[in-house]
Amino acid sequence: MSRFRIPGAGRLSPARPLRFTFDGRTYSGLEGDTLASALIANGVHLVGRSFKYHRPRGFLSAGAEEPSALVGIRRDATRQTPNVRATVQELYDGLAAISQNRWPALSFDVGAVNDLAAPLFSAGFYYKTFMWPRKAWKYLYEPAIRASAGLGVAPKEADPDRYAARFAHCDVLVVGGGAAGLSAALAAAESGASVVLADEQAEFGGSLRFESGAVIDGRLGWDWAQGAAARLAAMPNVRLLTRTTAFGYYTQNILGLAERLTDHLAAPDPAAPRERLWQIRAKRVVLATGAIERHMVFPGNDRPGVMLASAGRTWLNHHGAAVGSAVGVFAANDSGWLAALDLAKAGVRVAAIVDTRPAAGEEVTQAARAAGIEVLTGHTVTRTDGRLRIGSMTVRPVSGGGSARRIAVDALLMSAGWTPSLHLFSQSRGKVAFDEATQRFLPGQYAQDCACVGACNGTESLAAAVAEGFAAGEAAGREARKGLAKSPPPLTPPHKGEGDSAAPTTPSPLWGGVRGGGIAASGGGRPPAVDASEPCSGGALGDAAGGVKGRAFVDFQNDVTSKDIRQAVREGMRSIEHVKRFTTNGMATDQGKTSNLHGLAIAAQALGKPIPQVGLTTFRPPYTPVTFGTIVGHARGPLFDPTRRTTTHAWATRHGAVFEDVGQWKRAWYFPRAGEDMHAAVARECRTVRQAAGVFDASTLGKIEVVGPDAAAFMELIYTNPWQKLEPGRCRYGLMLREDGFIYDDGVVGRLAEDRFHVTTTTGGAARVLNQMEDYLQTEFPHLKVWLTSVSEQWAVIAVQGPKSRDIIAPLVEGIDVSDAAMPHMSVREGTICGVPTRLFRMSFTGERGFEINVPADYGEAVWEAVWAEAQKHGACAYGTEAMHVLRAEKGYIIVGQETDGTVTPDDVGLAWAIGKGK
């Protein structure tokens, strides 16, 4: 048993031990541990170094918001993942983790010299330092800064793992599997709706993981959660996704989710995907994403062993591990007191509870005194001491000028309240609203079909969260199923029992602050008075009494202090986005989950403005880091860019063609005979086309059908040429320009009927021309009745060019007179060739007589074989793209993208004649 593992505490079984290593040293853990909880159980708090100053860092949280405990995970030489949050990584037997951003060792890091040079690296230092001598930047400063940048080391080997992707749709998607989320999923599922419930943890339960006294429906909260999950798993209309993070909320209720499939396994199946990307469209979304506990901002708050109260409770109540043997608690709300009571109940000595408020809740105060815990209300922590882990804290009264007192501790739990997790809500384009009474942002105006429930909605009690989740789930399910099925009977929501904790899920902290300090929460319904000119005013946190000073950290990973944020304001930053970039607050891998609101409050205080007027930084996806492999999926290596082949590719291969890449297409470049190099082969092909005939695969050209009563009017608006008077059965060269008048694309257009055009584009322009047509049709000309359909891959195109081209195709076509009188140049006819339906174009890209045979792609190779057999009778040859380029250049025909570069007008290339006189 690890020395900080408490027998009988937690929910893990000691009968399932696991072995793992951290920085080469072997430790033991239990099945169900995270790497963080296992290290805590072994008394290990130092796990990393901060980004800028290389200060010792421990754990701050027990969840995805963790900014400090980033490690590298190594399975083998090819499987190394940097910047993994130890609080999320599940333990497995043989796990090997290494600390990051240190040299030569974690306990002795040469980079810590940066901490001594901290004045050189203050906020915005990159704008103000390393400016002299000028040449030193290129040869000294920049190389040194770049060499020291970053945290983990990216793997150098190719990723050997597989990744998967799935698309899904459902009536109701519930994000978050805590009490509110489970309740919402149950209600929605029982209404008959199809439901997807996703949670980033390995098990459902959310905050019930650490709420030891919660009771729902007469059962302990955690037991109720597992029972609810089992009920949902048994329902055919429910899909449960654990270890799945909803990282992005996009338009039309599409959410991106990353499911971790094998990172928790000791020996994963090499054929199984490591992660899966889900893209889910839901009729209704219920966000039950919870809240993130706020840390206190005071000097020395970054020392290993100083952590959030919820982290200490999670590791104690779920994993059975104590964070120390003499634990201090620093709080501004009752959540910290609950952590102290849980520790005391488990037999861990609580050195003291320090609370900035004049008084805490009566129930928790009485319980603390009954447990023999020293209570110091109206006090604050002014500093901590200890080299690689906290060894003591110094406290003093908030006001009244009392003397400072030093208390020995080996861990310090802190809690300044809770911040609703609104990242996904904001990504959905929802507008947040600032609640003055509780000094926090809450969901305001909704932009999509979603609802926020529980702690992320600011709901403060477990009972209210369960009821709110149930109501939202039932409403979402009924609305999504409206008119599709018989309405189910009224549902009965879960009932919260009497054993639940009395503390609200989301307390109501209020901000305060002074010179050099940060943020404190205070009771009383309104913020304390603040006098920024005095170091000890209003119960705020700042410089310690007696002139002792220290740095109070806001962003633990990027080493941003409260002083840095005030400095940014002094140097002219007024927008919170400017403050963010000047200080790098909230720009670390955690994207400011624990630091954004603190930085905002300090900046608002420095500016003398209310928090809402300063603004809120933009929440962008992903919510937490997502591996490149998850995003890329199968699209790598040969599958990164699809290789497209025409129907004659196999034939060309058999006949010795040399291929070239044209966009995604493999095209026959030339057909060398024995002893020929490219120049000889191309010269022969060109000569044969001029003297007899040649057969060429032109299937890669883009093909778009423009159909509808307004098709001709639409063509007039898209192309420079006139189209209204073009008769069915005739073709015309079409020129398309950008809005600035430069050439965009070209091609031959055949009018098949009054309301139907067969449009060809360049090979490279097929997709972009269709997109531009669609864009204009939907935004500029929505009144036109026109339908656009890409048929590029539906038609194989065989070009027969040369003086004998008519002799080659005449015996093969049925129902089409190919004489000059019946089918003049620039004509199109429909009939059959070799019994296959065809659109036959009389056109040329060589200057010789030519025909282009369009047949359904499935028949392309068969028709080609028939044409080739006939062509050989007339001395024709197959030719490739190189000969095509020579032949068209000899006649002065342009290719968009070769004779044009985006700055060429029609007149520049002799195409002024293609512009209609009335345009």
Regions found by a protein language model. Name each.
Residues M1-S487, A502, A520-T643, Q794:
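Residues forming the flavin
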Residues S37-V47, I704, P709-L726, D807, ...:
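A short, contiguous, amphipathic alpha-helix enriched in charged residues
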Residues A198, A291, A683-S699, I743-R756, ...:
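Residues forming anionic-ligand binding surfaces in small-molecule and nucleic-acid pockets
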Residues P493, G497-E498, W511-G516:
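Glycine-biased, low-complexity coil/linker segments
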Residues H598, A606-L737, F742:
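Acidic, proline/glycine-enriched N-terminal capping motif
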Residues H649, T653-R654, R667, A753-D755, ...:
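Conserved, structured C-terminal
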Residues Q724-D755, T760-Q772, Y776:
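Well-ordered mid-protein domain cores that form the structural environment of catalytic cofactors
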